[in-house]
Amino acid sequence: FPTPVAGIPIRAFDASAERLLKMGFRLAVADQVEPAEEAEGLVRREVTQLLTPGTLTQEALLPREANYLAAIATGDGWGLAFLDVSTGEFKGTLLKSKSALYDELFRHRPAEVLLAPELRENEAFVAEFRKRFPVMLSEAPFEPQGEGPLALRRAQGALLAYARATQGGALSVRPFRLYDPGAFVRLPEASLKALEVFEPLRGQDTLFGVLDETRTAPGRRLLQAWLRHPLLERGPLEARLDRVERF
């Protein structure tokens, strides 16, 4: 079947790719893989990159905040896992309700989401999900990997399979980290919106924008993570304050 292709000058690639990704396209980049003088007929080209919103590693295309790919599976609860391919951050949690799932998704704001087959086939769920989260929905095999509850292992497997497929097999990922949302102040979606933590209700100012004096991309992402997950326990709070006092 015919496949639309486009030639983009190499100097304009980043700007063109960014625009196409924002329009909802997945990009397959085909590069010349043999010298033109050695070619017999057409110069051979192969797909060398697959670009999707949640699997970017190119600095010029990455947003300033964490760029999460998320996967959701069901079973013994709602298994939710996140992977930032650009940094290797890999974490997840098991949730008891759909409302808790939506709160975690809103806090992390993934760029792309993988849905398990039982969710993709649920038209009511997909319609509700798209209304709440206007992000790219993609497919991957949900073969269990790692340890823990089945739903969470399925989500882990989907993230790794999809990331490897888009990165051509080359993938550097940190060990999976199980996190407990109960260790942090619970900030539901409505509270984050009302407090204008990341998105303004009026004007342009947000809490994050006022506090953001970071100098590096990792520092900016860390500040975002702290605001998304305020600490509850006294020990970690005092340790963080001690580190800040040194400056």
Where do the language-model regions lie?
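Charged catalytic and DNA/RNA-contacting regions of genome-maintenance
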Residues: 1-247
